[in-house]
């Protein structure tokens, strides 16, 4: 395989995606390893290496004695074609061994439209797609991530799911597997043992029955497994594992910077937001711990930017203390500090003025809806006055770029709400004219609308999704009311959002459609 591998690298785009060898990748001696895990991200290297969850769990598993976790990413179409043409199986970046050589194969599920990539990666690894076709204790396939809160569309393919946060459950899973391997247990015996770990769902132990109209009637567990699976959470973020020595990519990735997770959960409760509900309760790290982790990460990686990651960064209670500590380190070294997920109702000009000394970036806000009535309906607790006041403060401080994110198709939305988006944009433009301190540069407003996708375990999980035709009508209605040259409007395509809703809320029968699409050659999630 090695000779073929090197030859095909010269025929594909961005070969650095496939070779590994990055600074801080973890290499172990196979003689010292008794459990090998192939950690698969069902998307490209550039996206997967930007994922903080994957970096955390990669470190968690490799901290365990006798365990070697290696990375696997979905190949781009040109590489997949070469692999199929030459019979080259999917490999890991660290050892370049075939994925089929590994004890356990883990997938992280962060986006429903990557489900087809899970099947494609298993096929490229020359591993049977269906769980029932995989015998023995080798090639155990499990999955976690936010999409695992509804595991049913992938239930026929995945041996078990880890629901909730993975730092603690992952180590328990691997220790359970290590014990089963030493005892020579069968796959079924291992699955019965792992099902006793909190947060673990083994689909084959639950029988689904349906009514005559096709709706779900009941889910019956086998004896000895929980009727309901309780999600796992990390109780103490200050002591939770965080990788300060992370892999430095060999090629440019989507988010090419250090990421500092400041807290999990969200106090806001927006009714459409799955992460806001699934990652409750709020758990924060202290500013002292965060400063220490940030400095260690920056010194090790050499990155020129660090981002404070959370669902709502400006809600962090020690934000100014943390920012002051980080800026004392970052400013003299010309390292940019980025604060995404800011809210218009608690924007601090003084804080932002200091943060922007290294590099002034644009403002980003997500009002989500164009009128106060609809913002109240979705529990987006921000007023038009707060949005305009924040923009006035920022414009007077020298900002001249604003990104605005909205959704179309939210429950109870009317044409008045759609037109309200354009009206809010023009009010922001008027605020710029009255308060902008750098008018020679002009104002740039980047406006984006997404097609509302109802997600499980949110208050809107049962809401209907508008048709693609109605979505496009609302897009065109908004476009017809946007005339300012400074506004760049972009909208999501409707077809993918419709499929996303099906995958997000579907049951096991969706898996049959996934399998059929795979057999017909669907590859749109990557390409």
PLM regions: where:
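N-terminal [4Fe-4S]-dependent radical SAM core
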Residues: 8-38, 45-46, 203, 209, ...
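N-terminal pre-triad scaffold of radical SAM enzymes
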Residues: 39-43, 61, 248-274, 298, ...
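Conserved SAM/AdoMet-binding glycine-rich loop
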Residues: 40, 113, 295-403, 408-444
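Short secondary-structure boundary/capping segments
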Residues: 54-56, 86, 122, 156-161, ...
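Glycine-rich beta-alpha loop elements in corrinoid/cobalamin-binding modules
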Residues: 74-220, 456-507, 514-521
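A glycine-rich phosphate-binding loop feature that marks nucleotide/adenosyl-phosphate handling sites
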Residues: 193-204, 311-316, 340-346, 409, ...
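Iron-sulfur (Fe-S) cluster-binding segments and ferredoxin-like electron-carrier domains
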Residues: 273-289
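Conserved small/polar residues in nucleotide/adenosyl-binding loops
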Residues: 526
């Amino acid at each position: 395989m090695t000779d073929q591998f090197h030859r095909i690298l010269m025929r594909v785009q961005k070969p650095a995606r496939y070779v590994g060898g990055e600074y801080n990748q973890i290499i172990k001696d196979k003689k010292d390893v008794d459990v090998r895990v192939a950690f698969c991200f069902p998307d490209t290297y550039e996206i997967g290496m930007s994922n903080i969850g994957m970096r955390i769990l990669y470190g968690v598993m490799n901290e365990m004695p006798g365990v070697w976790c290696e990375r696997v990413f979905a190949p781009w179409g040109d590489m997949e074609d070469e692999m199929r043409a030459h019979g080259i199986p999917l490999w890991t970046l660290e050892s370049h061994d075939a994925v089929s050589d590994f004890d356990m194969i883990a997938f992280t599920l962060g986006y429903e439209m990557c489900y087809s990539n899970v099947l494609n990666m298993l096929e490229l690894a020359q591993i049977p797609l269906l769980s029932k076709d995989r015998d023995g204790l080798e090639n155990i396939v499990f999955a976690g991530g936010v999409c695992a809160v509804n595991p049913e569309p992938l239930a026929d393919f995945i041996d078990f799911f880890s629901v909730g946060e993975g730092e603690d459950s992952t180590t328990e899973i691997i220790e359970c597997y290590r014990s089963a391997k030493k005892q020579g247990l069968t796959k079924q015996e291992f699955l019965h043992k792992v099902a006793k770990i909190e947060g673990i769902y083994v689909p084959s132990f639950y029988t689904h029955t349906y009514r005559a109209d096709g709706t779900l009637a009941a889910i019956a567990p086998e004896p000895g497994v929980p009727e309901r699976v309780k999600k796992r959470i990390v109780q103490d973020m200050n002591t939770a594992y965080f990788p300060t020595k992370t892999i430095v990519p060999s090629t440019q990735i989507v988010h090419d910077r250090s990421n500092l997770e400041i807290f999990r959960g969200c106090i806001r409760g927006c009714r459409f937001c799955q992460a806001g509900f699934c990652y409750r309760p709020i758990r924060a790290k202290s500013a002292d711990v965060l400063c220490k982790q940030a400095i260690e990460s920056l010194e090790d990686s050499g990155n020129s930017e660090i981002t404070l990651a959370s669902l709502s960064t400006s809600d962090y209670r020690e934000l100014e203390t943390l920012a002051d500590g980080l800026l004392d380190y970052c400013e003299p070294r010309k390292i940019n500090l980025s604060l995404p997920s800011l809210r218009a109702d608690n924007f601090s000009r003084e804080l932002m003025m200091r943060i922007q000394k290294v590099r002034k970036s644009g403002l980003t806000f997500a009002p989500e809806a164009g009128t106060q009535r609809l913002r109240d309906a979705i529990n987006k607790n921000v007023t038009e006055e707060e949005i305009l006041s924040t923009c006035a403060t920022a414009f007077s401080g020298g900002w001249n770029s604003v990104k605005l994110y909205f959704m179309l198709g939210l429950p109870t939305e009317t044409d008045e709400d759609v037109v309200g988006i354009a009206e809010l944009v023009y009010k922001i433009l008027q605020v710029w004219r009255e308060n902008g301190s750098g008018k020679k540069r002009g104002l740039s407003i980047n406006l984006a609308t997404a097609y509302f996708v109802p997600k499980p375990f949110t208050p809107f999980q049962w809401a209907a999704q508008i048709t693609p035709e109605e979505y496009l009508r609302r897009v065109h209605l908004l476009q017809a009311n946007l005339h300012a040259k400074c506004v760049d409007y972009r909208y999501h395509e409707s077809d993918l959002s419709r499929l996303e809703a099906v995958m997000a809320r579907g049951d096991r029968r969706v898996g049959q459609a996934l399998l059929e699409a795979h057999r017909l050659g669907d590859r749109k999630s990557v390409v």
